[in-house]
UniProtKB/Swiss-Prot annotation:
InterPro entries: F-box-like_dom_sf, F-box_dom, FBL13/AtMIF1-like, LRR_dom_sf, LRR_FXL15/At3g58940/PEG3-like. Residues 1-47 form the F-box domain. This is F-box protein At1g10780. Coiled coil: none annotated. It comes from Arabidopsis thaliana (Mouse-ear cress).
């Protein structure tokens, strides 16, 4: 390395990212120390200062290291820091930073919670940020952010916030194309209007009764968890949609246009039947469908009503992969579900189906439905039958499992049992 020209040495060292590696290079020689000023990205891992007791000391070490860089573009800090330390860092590198990722740890203790919002305020001076990632955020008051005109990606993981604070933060990021909010607690009603947003993942933690209104003409993928009412009026380019609710009910979903939708996933303990019907009706051209909803009903838990097998597949002619769990499969296996079957009926595009069976009840109809899938889906390449938590003490359980095994042997090139 000593025989290399300065320019090549600087070029090689500029690819260092770990703060410990940069610090080690500074100790090699004066020439190496001077060459590390070309480092553009520095990562301080969680254990970077495990031998240092005082956070103020680690703050000063970070400041010295980042201030020695001519143009630091990416700063990632997982180690503990104070708001005053962050403010001093931003004074040195705010104009050049493009990516900032911070483990805020605002939720760790009451003492930190008091100073937490100040950390958010310090970030506001980094006007040229393109990517901002924050972990463990307290946002119970609006952050003092003016505007991030270049910010394209905002990710917040683990947060306590209220509606007005989140709205204020998003207004400071008008040009976002990627928004990720995971495990965010306290949001009850949020309206998001981001004209350039393409990818959005929202995970609201709590009772699962959040109201969401999202407006973006460019939206391509949307993943929502924890919302009971969802309205997205502009979805002309939406290709991937996932809606789930672990704790609450999904009462209403309103999407204006799902003509481009290719993949749809709906999950949850309970969805209102109107919401299920609406989303399935709007997603007529979907190619990949995943359904894991246990019950329907506006208040009390209700089983799925009967679904006509022929109408369902006629309404989704482009379906290629279909993953259905207990309740939906049972709805397709009712007494009259197969009554419209006729010789001209086909399922033209279906290639793979995964079926989760949880009950031996209505076994004969379930076997008829499985046989119909094989018969009418001429292009079927794979069928997976998952037997999950079936109560073996039920009188018909053994017979049903025997029937499934026989069905598998008759179609061993297609059918797999898990």
């Amino acid at each position: 390395m000593d025989s290399l020209p300065d320019a090549i040495l600087q070029y090689i060292l500029s690819y260092l990212t770990s703060a410990r590696d940069v610090a080690a290079c500074n100790c090699v020689s004066k020439r190496w120390k001077e060459s590390t000023d070309s480092v553009k990205s520095v990562v301080f891992h969680r254990n970077s200062f495990e031998s240092i007791m005082e956070t103020d000391d680690s703050d000063s070490i970070v400041r010295k290291m980042i201030s020695s860089s001519r143009r630091l573009e990416e700063l990632v800090v997982y180690s503990p820091f104070t708001s005053s330390g962050l403010a001093s860092w931003m004074m040195h590198v705010s104009s050049s930073l493009r990516l900032l990722e911070l483990r805020m740890d605002n939720l760790a203790s009451e003492e930190v919670v008091v100073e937490g919002p100040l950390k958010l305020d310090c970030i506001g001076v980094a006007k040229n940020l393109e990517i901002l990632k924050l972990w463990g955020v307290l946002m119970m008051s609006p952050p003092k952010w003016d505007m991030f005109p270049n910010l394209r990606s905002l990710e917040i993981v683990g947060a306590k916030m209220d509606d007005s604070s989140l709205s204020h933060a998003l207004r400071a990021c008008p040009n976002l194309s990627n928004l990720l909010l995971l495990a965010c607690e306290g949001v009850k009603s949020i309206s998001i209007d981001l004209p350039y947003l393409e990818h959005c993942k929202l995970d609201f933690y709590g009772q699962g009764n959040t109201l969401l209104v999202l407006t973006s003409q460019r939206l391509v993928s949307l993943d929502v968890q924890g919302c009971s009412w969802i309205r997205v009026p502009e979805t002309k380019f939406l290709k991937n949609l996932s809606i789930s609710s672990v704790t609450g009910r999904v009462y209403m979903v309103d999407f204006n246009n799902l003509s481009s939708l290719e993949a749809l996933s709906i999950r949850g303990v309970q969805w209102c039947w109107d919401a299920i019907c609406m989303i399935l009706q709007q997603a007529r051209d979907v190619k990949h469908l995943f359904m894991k909803v246990e019950f329907t009903g506006n208040e009390a838990l209700q089983p799925f009503p009967e679904i006509d097998f022929v109408e369902f597949f006629n309404n989704h002619p482009k379906l290629q992969t279909f993953d259905i769990h207990g309740a939906m499969f049972a709805a397709l296996c009712q007494k009259n579900s197969l009554k419209k079957l006729e010789t001209g009926f086909t399922i033209p595009c279906l290639e793979e189906v995964v079926i989760t069976v949880r009950s031996p009840l209505n076994a004969e109809q379930k076997m008829n439905t499985l046989e119909s899938l094989v018969k009418y889906a001429r292009g079927l390449k794979r069928m997976v039958i998952r037997i999950l938590r079936m109560k073996s003490n039920h009188s018909s359980a053994d017979d049903f499992c025997d029937d499934i095994c026989k069905f598998r042997h008759m179609n061993e090139h297609l059918v797999h049992i898990e």
